[in-house]
Amino acid sequence: MPKLKTKSGAKKRFKITGTGKVMYAQAGKRHGMIKRTNKQIRNLRGTTTLFEGDAANVKKYFLPNQR
């Protein structure tokens, strides 16, 4: 049986670290930032760790060969 293909949308959005955690970029920085404080905008920078339950689903269904 051949390997399962990775979902191309998931490989653009998620990255798996060496320890197996799933990292993602935070949403909410595309437009409409005039309404937000500088602190809110600053806190949206960089990447964040996905919660363990969600990370398990991402690894199982969307990134099957990256475990």
Swiss-Prot record:
Q: Which family does it belong to?
A: Belongs to the bacterial ribosomal protein bL35 family.
* Lineage top rank: taxon: Bacteria
The lineage, from the top, is: Bacteria, Pseudomonadati, Pseudomonadota, Alphaproteobacteria, Hyphomicrobiales
Q: Which keywords does this chain's UniProt record carry?
A: Ribonucleoprotein, Ribosomal protein
Which Gene3D superfamilies has this protein been placed in?
Answer: 4.10.410.60
UniProt GO cellular component terms: cytosolic large ribosomal subunit
GO terms of biological process kind:
translation
User: Know the name of this protein?
Assistant: Large ribosomal subunit protein bL35
Claim: Cytoplasm is one of the keywords in the record: no
Which molecular function terms from Gene Ontology are attached?
structural constituent of ribosome
* Species of the source: Methylorubrum extorquens (strain PA1) (Methylobacterium extorquens)
